[in-house]
Amino acid sequence: MTASPAMRSVADVVAGLGSAAVRPSVGVAVDQLGRPGSRHRIPTPALVVDADALAANIDAAQRGADMAGVRLRPHAKTHKSAAVARLQLDAGASGVCVAKVGEAEALAGAGIDDLLVTSPIRPHLVERVADLRAAGVAVAVVADHPDVVPALAGAASTGAPLDVLVDVDVGLHRTGVAEARDSAALAELIAAQPDLRFRGVQGYGGHWQHVADPAERADAVAAGMRRLVECIRAIEGTGLTIDRCSGGGTGTFAVDCELGVLNELQPGSYAFMDQQYADALDGDAAPWRQALFVQATVVSANHDGFVTVDAGLKAFATDAGHPGASPSTYRWFGDEHGLVTQPPDHELRLGDRLELVPPHCDPTVDRYDVLHVVRDDVLVDVVPIEARGCSQ
């Protein structure tokens, strides 16, 4: 991972210690950068990214999108890092997605300037969208209810029209317009505002991403896309044009490419991957590689059959089971600790390092300040997670 104008190097990280972006408690081992074996001398628990696996994942997704003739707009809610976003953009991504306005602000502040906010914008946040646009950031938003349209129009009144997509409920029932006629009415309302520009639709099925059986997953996506197509036809029936049809995810990436309904794909987890995807996709996880780990240290080894490590409930998101520790197993052992069984082929001892696979990558990343980037056994860079905690 090499530095670019929009990417802070480890020197920048160290200079920023004590700032809002990087906290003094990070414990960055600056003197270890580039040294043989430095991967195993990072203060733990720490978030570690395998540079080669990350690069392979980014390349595979971009090649897949290019072969399908669709745009790739990766979701930065996974990595929350301008450095990783820059790698994705350099590989050919058309822009990046963010979940919240706060994430857009953080990444825009680090030089990422083409953003789609994929969660409906609450009226009290539209002024912050206006501020981003005033700063020259190309930001688009989604809407799923007519009541928010006047606020969006008001925020856009001082500049070029704000791009808006209609968010369609394709079966998740979390956000989105449920009925085709309502999607058409909302699109017409958006298009009628001089300060807004209707650009298309978004349809995301998060509930499909971890369906284990490939055939069942494909059938579920196809059914959801039929709902999206119904909305598209209803909107086009009003005379409006659909420029962007955005959605998709990591678990459905291949199906999304094959179906051809979406012309802009939003996978996020593919960059890092996690144990939840490994368990759900099993052999169907290709071409993605595990790139994200939480490195932990054995801090107690006084009992037969297991050791205690310094990564517990605070080190991982806990919504998706236990971290992966193959060939050992991991169990929660408190806020600060985890229990790891002794592996069958060797004995873990006090001070040994382990790299554990997070159960769920997105919220695990949100618990850390920096990514420790490694290649083989060398720590090659440390970059900030600018959008950590930006949940508004």
Please annotate each region the language model reported.
Residues R39-A51, D113-L115, A130-V141, A212-A222, ...:
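Glycine-rich tight-turn/loop motif centered on a GG-T
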Residues P74-Q209:
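Active-site-proximal beta-alpha core segment in soluble small-molecule metabolic enzymes
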